[in-house]
Each structure stands twice: as C-alpha cells, then as structure tokens.
C-alpha cells in the first residue's frame, strides 16, 4: 500500500518537473548540456550483468571479473591479452550502436536551439546520434583514439580499423602480436586516449573544442541560458556539475536542470532556479 502511494506521487512529481523543464527549454536562448555516465547508462550502455557476460564471459571465468571496469584495470601480463580485452571493450562501447535512442531523443529537443555539449563520456555517442561535432567538447578523451603510452608527442590516432582487426583475429583471449598497436613516432606501446593520469594527450582538436566551449559561454553569459545536467555524478564534479552550479548562481537569467536517477539535486543557493528530476533520463526526455 505505502509503496504504491509513494510510486504514484513520485510519478506525478516527475511529470510536473518534466513540464517545467519543457517550458524552460522552450524559453531558453541557449542550452548547455553537461553529460555524464548516467546518460549512456540510460541509453543501454551498462557495464555489468547480461551485457558483460555476453562479450566477456571468458575473461570473467578466468579472472573472476564481474563487470567491464574491473577488467579494464587488470594488469595483464602480456599485451596480446591486454588488447584482446580492450579491443572488445572499445568495440562494444564505442563502435556498436546504443541499445536505446536516448541520444537521438536529446538531439530532437535541442537541435533547433543554440546549444553546446560538454561531456565526460568517452563513447562518442553524441556524434553518432547526429550532434554537430563543433558543438561538442569531450573533456576526458575518446575510446576511438589511441595515443602513445609515454607519451612522446601530443598526437592521437583513430583506431577503428585496428580494433576491428583485433576483434576478428583474436583467439584464446589473445590478439596476434603484429596487431599490438605501437606509436608510429617512438615505437612504444600505444594506449587509449583516456584521462587516467598526467599522460593524457590533449591534442589540437581537444584544445579547439575547449576554446569553442569557452567562447560559447562568453557569448551567452547575459542571456537566458539553461544548464542541463544529464547523468553526471561526483567522480569529476568540477568539470560539469560544480561549474554549472556556479554559473547558474552567478548568471541572473540562467537556470539549472538535472535529470539523474538517484542523484538529482541542487544546492540551496540555486534552488529557486533549479529543476531536479529523480528518474531515468530516457524516460523523462520522452515526456518533454
């Protein structure tokens, strides 16, 4: 009895907040989307359970992994096994299509607005869904790029064809030695272009995107701007969440909206200009 009542109230509250968000979107001069892992989770990119077992059951059996993240951090003894794991990881989370059209639904809501996207996600789903690449800033890298593990230079390299070959030719949890990627400049092993430590490569494209984002914020500071926080958590809060809170507080005509199942909240300083929806992102986007 109690659970039904709470669920009904929760649904009604979510619908009311979705209506407020629809109105805020319609009235905004600009929309700044900040996206985190929760957005891709809503789109079906889950890293454990059935999806993990489908693609990594052999690694799970050998090493006892229960999710993709665990396997990604494991210190494999040989590069051939390391790349057998990572080529699958990259393929299913970067080159395969998302199971649900959440990114496409988001694009439909903002495509006619003056928008910009900043994201800590590295799965390239915004571009795959049709977002303008000149309105995207991937701060933490891209599964689709290799870099030198040293690194000896600030260069990145597209990896789709190499990853495809490693997927097709691996046997017994190992890729052929000749497919192990090495830096074309210094010959050292390559790694993914992911921000894990101070070896992360910020190439020319990264810096151009950072400047476009900064310029977008400068141009819209005095306008009605909606900061739309989708699925960001507290792993790297300074990149999206904290900066959105600060700008929503400092800009008189700005508003903040957050959709995130289990983590939808805003500080008291901006409570009056915030819309927080504790629900699945994809479900809410369909209500707007």
How should these model regions be labeled?
Residues 1-288:
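Conserved catalytic alpha/beta core of Sir2/sirtuin-type deacylases, generalized to analogous enzyme cores
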